Amino acid sequence: MAPTPELSPETLARHLAVLGPASGYCVAYSGGLDSTVLLHLMAALSAARELPLRAVHIHHGLQPQADAWAEHCRQQAAALGVDCLVLPVEVRRDSGEGLEAAARQARYAALASHLQSGEALLTAHHADDQAETVLLHLLRGSGPRGLAGMRAQRPLGRGRLLRPLLPWPRERLRAYGDTHALCWVEDPSNAHVAHDRNWLRHTLWPVLTQRWPDASRRVGRAAGEQAEAEALLRELAGEDLARHPPGPGLAVSVLARLSPARARNLVRHWLLMSGLRPPPRARLEQGLADLIRAGRDRQPVLTWPEGELRRYRDRIHRLPAGGPPPWPGPDREWDLRVPLVVPGVGVLRLVRADEGIAPSLIGAEGLSVGRRRRGERCQLAHDPGHRPLSKRFQEAGIPPWERDRVPILRRGEEVVAIANLGTAKRFTARPGYRLICEEHGPDGG
């Protein structure tokens, strides 16, 4: 392996160029050694190349020294000629994921919300951090995605998250800090070996580096191989997804033709595409097999803390944990003039059509939108007579858990239209408007 270059503003600039351009840079500045070194390097780059630069310090309020750390960051950034914004965040202690994970979630949410368009957020993760991450994932039994460790870049908010210090080990950062007489704070919680990462850092890592001094580079190289394998699996999942017939969710008939490993790979990446973290391997293996083997008249459910998979007929649907939100409250008045947002359901709008809702209804009084009512019936444009809405939903293949969320447009007590299904005969004109609902949900298409 080629030796790691010296850590300097020039080498950092070359590495940033590989990661791509940005409209400006924002350093996530905790006040510790790593982010202090990064801010010092970026301040030198900013002065030499007139790069827009600012810093953000997240005030978690979890340590007695939190206020002092925030003031330290303001002063150190000011000494470098960099504006530093202090953002207080509230860390949920009842999240069920542990205090460290909750703090990380709150931190990134705050950083993402304050990132400007095209701006790059820089974090100071280095090669030793990457090695620790990979080893922790290995001990948790993770697959290629976890063993790939932290990505050098990813989308975040309106910009990107960059980790430009990943090529350099911790010792290089400390040497840089000592050489430039930098001042940083020490978080006492980093010494608590009750945390897995701290135990690995203070207990196991010194033993590994005594035997293999370049252990972080070796683990980093392995992470790169795993990242490539994960990219290939993602590409394969994309090809398998493209073979699915149109419609929401995944087709059971297509999944059943794949090997179990390939089917799990497709489902895993399909969930990640929607922002849902997949279930653990054993849960996914058994649950997906049950979903595929179930008869068409069955409605099995695979649940895990982050979401659900449900089967209806030949499709598997992804849903948030606990299922979709119910219809929000009573009927809503709507005069059809502008789109209507129904929280948790979607956006209702009219689109021109050869046949549909009569234009004379736009702006009319007495119009409202709500969910179906018990025993409700209607006659759509080409029906011979009135039929129950429940029967229509079943024929349209609408899953049972969605039927109470289908928007129904009424005038008084009469059904005018059913979103995405049709217009009542009595209110139909040529030309007219179709009532459509563009869904918000994770399985909106």
From Swiss-Prot:
What is one GO biological process annotated to this record?
tRNA modification
Asked whether the UniProt record includes Chaperone among its keywords, one would answer no
- Regarding domains, what does the record say? The N-terminal region contains the highly conserved SGGXDS motif, predicted to be a P-loop motif involved in ATP binding.
Q: Which GO terms describe its molecular function?
A: ATP binding; tRNA(Ile)-lysidine synthase activity
Alphabetical GO CC annotations of the entry are: cytoplasm
- Locate the residues binding ATP: S30, G31, G32, L33, D34, S35
Cellular compartments annotated = Cytoplasm
Q: Which NCBIfam families match?
A: lysidine_TilS_C, lysidine_TilS_N
Instruction: Alphabetically list the UniProt keywords.
Output: ATP-binding, Cytoplasm, Ligase, Nucleotide-binding, tRNA processing
What does the UniProt function comment say about this protein? Answer: Ligates lysine onto the cytidine present at position 34 of the AUA codon-specific tRNA(Ile) that contains the anticodon CAU, in an ATP-dependent manner. Cytidine is converted to lysidine, thus changing the amino acid specificity of the tRNA from methionine to isoleucine.
Q: Which SMART domains match?
A: TilS_C
Know the name of this protein? tRNA(Ile)-lysidine synthase
State which Enzyme Commission number(s) the record gives: 6.3.4.19
- Family to which the UniProt record says this protein belongs: Belongs to the tRNA(Ile)-lysidine synthase family.
Please list the reactions this protein catalyses. cytidine(34) in tRNA(Ile2) + L-lysine + ATP = lysidine(34) in tRNA(Ile2) + AMP + diphosphate + H(+)
